[in-house]
């Protein structure tokens, strides 16, 4: 097929055009090592092969074998001159498929002085559902939290969600994709999800749909563009008046409204971690998203707000308008053997404007849990504790966090870690009903940082890393001034977190 002689062990499992797109090597072109490396990367990026080997053998050219000897190298549209001397190469590519279907189970648990929590996700994946290396994913998530507070009116919180996605190994666009020839490993992912949440003070349904384009331009860099990102937050049980009655914070009140979120996002990732997990490595993640701008422009041009309301609506639902961005930079330094020192810096900011007075609750930042400040679940804004202590809702517009972790082998598949976490969240502006201390200020934020240490165990069971972290608070900015440094050990100042995979 277009210069490829494809041999299958049994029945054809991948359509020839898919393999042709992944192998930029053509007959009668000069050998090019970068194209060979790209062929290997593109084959593995399909997600269908467990391994791929590219082997070359010399084959002298003779007049009667011109049509069966293949040159390896430049792409079909290359202007390179044909190699006309002896020393021709034959190329054999041996690909071993991985399991077509798989099931994955993720567990995450935590316990603090306030509640116990357990979350489980069961995922199914078909890596070649239409014989074109299309990947179909389906996952089910269930979560349960039990409040320890004896005076809590409702002690349970539950969550159930379904997510499905279909990933194509090419760009799905309504025009010819020839202009994207310089783009490596193009993919398109279509996603749908729905999530039901029943909390002590409210219940809601989260629905989302989106299309994401993903690609790379080098060995370590990856990009994603999500031009369509639609989310609907439906408050199926309005927020309990008792819950809102304790606050006059309009930011919190507006965060729990039925909302329509329509926007776009962009992401960049850099990771030079080697596949065998050896050696030093740097990981960078940057994300930016905005919502409501196009809708807002159309609404202002042709419509007016509904009578008696200040906000514009779409389909009868107020739409959100905001900007959000975050950056994570981590570095792993090997100290010898399997011992490593890993550090991370994280910062994020979100700001509502236009049709919104607050960022949607699910786009706000939180601080605490198994992947952040492991001494808390969660940590509050600035230096002020949230008054709703039997089910704390503690999120903000600004987040700063730093983590340092020493990882070392213990015995066999068991590894240990000692860690330090530093960080907190704040509001970007002052909201009525909240203390001025909850607002981020450069002249005082460093005094409001939470600080914890802790110990962890990691169980490397080949296909996953199970993690158990015990965080111990050292500086709690939620405590009154003069009592923030914790000198006496108390169980209520600790948190036990269970997770799958490394935190960063």
What kind of region is each of these model predictions?
Residues 87, 116-118, 154-162, 203-207, ...:
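Residues that define the transmembrane beta-barrel architecture of outer-membrane proteins
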Residues 22-23, 101-111, 120-122, 133-151, ...:
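Transmembrane beta-strand segments that form the barrel wall of outer-membrane beta-barrel proteins
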Residues 1-108, 327, 348:
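Periplasmic polypeptide-binding modules associated with outer-membrane biogenesis and secretion
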